Amino acid sequence: MGDNIVINLNNVSRSYGNVKVIEKLNFTINKGTINSLIGSSGSGKTTILKTILGKLKQDDGIVQVFGKEPCGKGSEIPGSSVGYAPQDVCLYNEITIEETLSFFASIHRMPKDEYIKKRDSLVEILELPSLSKIISELSGGQQRRVSLATALIHSPKLLILDEPTVGVCPLVSSKIWEHLIFLTKNFGVTIIITTHYLQECRSCDNIFLLRNGRILESGPPNYLLSKYECSLLEDVYYKLCRGDEEISLQLIDSKNNEKINRDINTSIPLEFISNGANINNDDILISNTNKPIIKKDAKIYKERLSDFKNKLQIWFSHSITISIRKLTQMYRLKFPLVFEIISPSLLITLFFLAIGNVPHDLKFGIKNIDSGSLSGDFINALSDGNNIFNFIQINDTSNAIQMIESSDLWGLIDIPVNFTNGMINKLFNPLEKSFENSEMEIYMDLSNFQMNLMVDVQFQKAFNKIANDSGIKLLPTNFHAVYGDQNANFNWFLAPAMICIITYVHCMNFLSITFVREKNDGTRDRILLYGVSPVSNVLGHILAHIPILLVQFSIQLLIAVFAFGVPIKGNIVLIYLFFILINTVGMCQGILISLISKAEVDAVQLCLAIFICSLCMAGIIWPTEAIITFGWISNLVPTKWSGLALRGIMIKDLPFSHQHIWKSLIIIISYIIGTFSLIVISTPIGDRNFNFKKLFKRIKK
């Protein structure tokens, strides 16, 4: 009997919060039978299917499929032993029918000739439209048939079909049922379906009638019709629901609140086990046995798991398959693809145009009543070779101050009488003369720190130029450039890190939205159910995104170098290496964000929060050395290290042996390993919707 049992549920319960969805459920399903779960919405059908598939963890009881707990050691679930067609079609809208079937065949590692043979057979049975049609162009019924084809393509031992014939014409529905019966009779395939069309269930070997998470009755259709003296299964279900409702009312009205044993005796008289109306119900056995059945015939699966080399090959094969599918999806969406490639370049161009440049055309008032030439030389030095200042002659100081207050002027330079003589006396006879008339008065709006700093620098440069032209050295210092250039501008500092963070957040946002969509539309869980590991799924998306990253980065570098003069002095290979690594961190963080986000807007908001934190704490626009109180936080931001390394390579030509380079590389790789590990730990299908209340109860015990 153990070899014949495919599914065994023993006292299984499952809750969502305080609501019991299924309670003390007991049933077994035998090999080579078609079994139908019948019940209204909320009766627990989908929860039972998800528990069997390992997508939900039961609160209590034992669930065994092929003799093992789903997702447990040695289990065939997840894997290719099961075929699943969910109620939501869970297909990729951007690819064709052929690409869809080929993708799932590759996931199951089917030989090409076997795939073609099975594909052609399913096209005929399910009457699929042209294989070149894109999924989004199909009707709902056509999409459901394609979904069913993906569940059948690899010839699984267990088929779980949720509403497989909804929206399908009666003729095709009849052919589907004929094929399902053929599979059970000739290949011993076990099938579980849910449906609202009770008359379809006349072809089933077994029917389970559910209400409020309990089995009201089960058995072959003719047995149920005979037992309850009905001509239609709808009438049988109606009688059972009415009886169950009356028992519930009696229980509520009972003063003693006596517990009523409502377990159904599902043993069936032998005369109903084989009958003409039930097409293929040979050797059906319904049992509520509590004895765990352990199937020992899992040799091939155990050998594959124990062979690490083969496991790596499977991971690699799945990763390549997913990356090809993802690239195909992106290629089909032309506008999003172009936007994905161009938008970082547009942002970096906007950044270069708006940030880091020296201001120009600043209106400054000049009140110059100096009789000497030094004041004129100073004004000429300020205007020499640039258009930073736009000088306006002013005669009245108070009037100029009013213009500054009304924002008509940035400032006023008030040069006193005999300024030239005063400066000469200050420099050459400091003890003989006072410093009167040796200082000019500057009136400015000092609320703009950055602008004040730039103006101050220009004034100092002008005085140094006058002094140097006269052979006088004002400052007792000589600056020598060990790295960089004295003519470097602020963009040299900003560009390497800014290019990084733009693409970093772009990748994070793109991957988080992608994974939230795949999580919500069911496509992610579907491939995980077929044995695709979280490692392969993540690697597949990362591999698909790397070609786009390389194009993005190349365009940004060309813009930075040829349009805005940012130098690249170091090893270009190291530059690309750090760029790919930091964006891999961004992609992994995006996937991690998707695991805790219910909707795309949640993921976008989290990405925006990380972007703001990185912009402020990573030393991108201001040195991290200026962060005094919480400076240690900047060490936790990965873009700090990529910016540090890229500045070192691009501007300083630092070798790999320099501590800024190899330390940054180790830290970024550690981030990748850490986030990747969190994804792998958090994603496994068996841990979804885990009941933490039960876990805490066990801890207390």
UniProtKB/Swiss-Prot annotation:
Molecular function terms, GO-annotated: ABC-type transporter activity; ATP binding; ATP hydrolysis activity
Superkingdom of origin organism: Eukaryota
Gene Ontology process terms (BP): sorocarp development
Keyword NADP applies: no
Main localization of the protein described in the UniProt heading: membrane
GO cellular component: plasma membrane
Subcellular localization, as worded in the UniProt entry: Membrane
Any Pfam family the entry gives: ABC2_membrane_3
Keywords from the named record: ATP-binding, Membrane, Nucleotide-binding, Transmembrane, Transmembrane helix, Transport
InterPro entries reported in the protein's UniProt record: AAA+_ATPase, ABC2_TM, ABC_transporter-like_ATP-bd, ABC_transporter-like_CS, P-loop_NTPase
Membrane-crossing residue ranges in chain numbering: 335-355, 493-513, 541-561, 574-596, 608-628, 665-685
Domain ABC transmembrane type-2: 459-686
Residues binding ATP: G39, S40, S41, G42, S43, G44, K45, T46
Chain ranges of the ABC transporter domain: 7-237
Membrane-protein topology: Multi-pass membrane protein
Family classification: Belongs to the ABC transporter superfamily. ABCG family.
Family annotation (PANTHER family): ABC TRANSPORTER G FAMILY MEMBER 20 ISOFORM X1 (PTHR43038:SF3), ATP-BINDING CASSETTE, SUB-FAMILY H, MEMBER 1 (PTHR43038)
Name used for this protein in its record: ABC transporter G family member 23
Gene name in the database record: abcG23
